[in-house]
């Protein structure tokens, strides 16, 4: 981890990170994080009864548990603004909301109707304006006009699906769904699967998302703010997430190890100089501290922050290159999966930029109208 941050610091005058996600590999000695969090979230409907430590409340926006039988959101109401009618997302026609109408539940209903939650994304995705049923096309081909075509309503206690078709093309379906949602206090509950993955998610107020899988491996998607400047800000954001995450684990799992790790993490946050932060991170790696010793890069992108004032020559890019140009002028390096990957493509990017500058200078010095076609091909296509 310290070597990655050291390199990102070395190039931060030219490159800034955009997407950055990573994994914390499961360790047997820390216990069943997934199982204990699942048990706590499943049995409670008040945020305070899950997250006891009030010091970390401002950092955590939402907890989500999703498996095949149940999807449950627990929201921290204090982290949401007061919504007005003009800010509401028009999603009511996707849901039947059941609530006990208490003040707490009514506020949760207001939040649910106003924010773009994963339930909204899921139900919008599963509502298909047009879908071809290829099985019914085969029936038409092989069975003639007597083939049966389904249209109508299918439903269970929590999901109603309406399938409509055109009489002239009955194999083309329009599918609409409505989902029942139960809202009690801080909890938003629906039955059945509402995600591809079975995970527990912790959504932070800074938009960082932590996904915990069944084996307690974690996937962390680190958010990026416009005011993030350089590697030191990135380290502070990551370790701020660590600090609050580990105190949450100590809260739920009752394992003092996480409190000890949170204290070590806090030393990194309190350090003011980058060199001191990197030194402390290196020491954490040497002592096999959770969060550093089991850190594994998932994928990250870099963007070249300086302006490209010369002509861009796409022909210099390999077909499978991770160097991409956005809108012709913005250079991005995408899908980097290791420090070696990063250093390799940054070097390629630097060399390519120099070559483009040289070609651009030549191109600007010649008369395009009189120059030979072969010479122009050499500049533009090779």
Swiss-Prot record:
Keywords: Activator, Early protein, Phosphoprotein, Transcription, Transcription regulation. Pfam families: Pox_int_trans. Induction: Expressed in the early phase of the viral replicative cycle. InterPro entries: Poxvirus_intermed-TF. Heterodimerizes with protein A8 to form the virus intermediate transcription factor (VITF)-3. Belongs to the orthopoxvirus OPG150 family. Acts with RNA polymerase to initiate transcription from intermediate gene promoters. This is Intermediate transcription factor 3 large subunit. It comes from Monkeypox virus. The gene is OPG150.
């Amino acid at each position: 981890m310290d070597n990655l941050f050291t390199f990102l610091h070395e190039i931060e005058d030219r490159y800034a990170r955009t997407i950055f996600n990573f994994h914390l590999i499961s360790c047997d000695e820390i216990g069943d994080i997934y199982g204990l969090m699942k048990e706590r979230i499943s049995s409670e409907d008040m945020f305070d009864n899950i997250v006891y430590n009030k010091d970390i409340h401002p950092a955590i926006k939402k907890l989500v548990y999703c498996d095949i039988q149940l999807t449950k959101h627990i929201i921290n109401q204090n982290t949401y603004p007061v919504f007005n009618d003009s800010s509401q997302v028009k999603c009511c026609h996707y849901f039947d909301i059941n609530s006990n109408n208490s003040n707490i539940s009514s506020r949760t209903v207001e939040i649910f109707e106003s924010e773009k939650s994963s339930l909204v994304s899921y139900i919008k995705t599963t509502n298909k304006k047009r879908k071809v049923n290829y099985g019914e096309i085969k029936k038409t081909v092989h069975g003639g006009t007597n083939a049966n075509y389904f249209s109508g309503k299918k439903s269970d206690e929590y999901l109603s699906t309406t399938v409509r078709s055109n009489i002239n093309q009955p194999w083309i379906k329009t599918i609409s769904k409505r989902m029942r949602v139960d809202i009690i206090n801080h909890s938003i509950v629906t039955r059945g699967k509402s995600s591809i993955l079975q995970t527990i998610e912790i959504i932070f107020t800074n938009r960082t998302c932590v996904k915990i899988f069944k084996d307690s491996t974690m996937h962390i998607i680190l958010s990026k703010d416009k005011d993030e400047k350089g590697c030191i800000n990135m380290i502070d954001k990551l370790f701020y997430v660590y600090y609050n995450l580990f105190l949450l684990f100590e809260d739920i799992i009752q394992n003092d190890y996480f409190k000890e790790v949170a204290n070590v993490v806090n030393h990194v946050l309190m350090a003011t100089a980058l060199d001191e932060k990197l030194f402390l991170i290196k020491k954490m790696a040497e002592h096999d501290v959770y969060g550093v010793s089991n850190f594994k890069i998932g994928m990250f992108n870099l963007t070249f922050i300086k302006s490209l004032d010369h002509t861009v020559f796409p022909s210099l890019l390999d077909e499978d290159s991770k160097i991409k140009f956005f809108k012709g002028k913005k250079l991005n390096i995408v899908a980097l999966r290791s420090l070696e990957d990063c250093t390799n493509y940054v070097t390629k990017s630097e060399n390519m930029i120099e070559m483009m500058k040289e070609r651009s200078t030549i191109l600007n010095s010649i008369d395009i109208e009189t120059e030979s076609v072969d010479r122009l091909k050499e500049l533009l296509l090779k």
